[in-house]
A protein has these predicted regions:
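A residue-level marker of the well-folded mature domains of exported/periplasmic proteins
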Residues: 1, 5, 14-223
Length: 223
């Protein structure tokens, strides 16, 4: 989270940044950062709280708006950032596939994307960048845990409840999860798969629906 705010400042020309032992000192005096959240939740609120502290410590001004999971709202927010002369935009995209459109709207304002990664083809060093974890590794770890817990089984039946359909984390985790299981040489059956959008209630409804099928399962994975 701190790195996101720091990059939001250091994207701009004329700012000073130095690093020693992993700590980054950023001079953000006079810099205005506009944050467009895809949707406020506990995770994003934690990230933004840390980003605010980092921005304020550097002397930067930071404002945060919630797009409420609406592409239209996010487009309007980027337009607002341009109209109000913000220096940098931090954007958790509602749909990472809209990144190119958001960049076009932003014009000369640099964008730091976070949490959901746009395609590498629309990123550009020092102007349109992404800060986030390697989601494929998360999917790999999930698969490795299942394989470790079920090392005595030659066949594994899996229920897979995924995050939002258009989120890069969902895509990266799910793909590498399946690839790692496949590479194990075991017979892997995904007996149920759907997008629960990281919502407990939706996940419970889908799992109840699955149970009605009477199919056997060995593991339930939520990514």
């Amino acid at each position: 989270a701190a790195l996101v705010a720091a990059l939001g400042v250091t994207c701009l020309g004329g700012c000073q940044a130095g690093s020693t032992g992993g700590d980054t000192a950023v001079n953000g005096k006079g810099v205005k950062i506009y944050v467009s959240l895809s949707q406020a939740d506990a995770f994003c609120n934690t990230l933004i709280d840390a980003a605010k502290k980092t921005a304020e410590a550097s002397g930067a001004e930071i404002v945060v708006y919630d797009a409420e999971n609406s592409i239209e709202n996010q487009v309007a927010q980027i337009k607002q950032a341009v109209a109000e002369d913000y220096d940098a935009i931090m954007c958790g995209p509602v749909d990472a596939d809209t990144a190119l459109e958001l960049e076009a709207l932003a014009g000369d304002i640099p964008i730091v994307f976070y949490n959901s990664c746009p395609d590498a083809s629309v990123l550009e060093p020092d102007k349109y960048i992404y800060v986030g974890s390697d989601e494929g590794v998360a999917g790999q770890y999930q698969a490795e845990y299942i394989l470790d817990q079920m090392s005595d089984k030659d066949e594994i039946n899996v229920v897979l409840l995924k995050g939002p359909k258009n989120h890069s984390a969902t895509k990266g985790r799910s793909e590498e999860f399946k690839n790692t299981l496949k590479a194990s040489g075991k017979k892997i059956n995904v007996v149920f798969e759907d997008n629960a959008d990281w919502e407990q209630g939706i996940a419970e409804d889908y799992f109840d629906l699955f149970l009605q099928t009477g199919k056997q399962f060995d593991a339930v994975v939520c990514n």
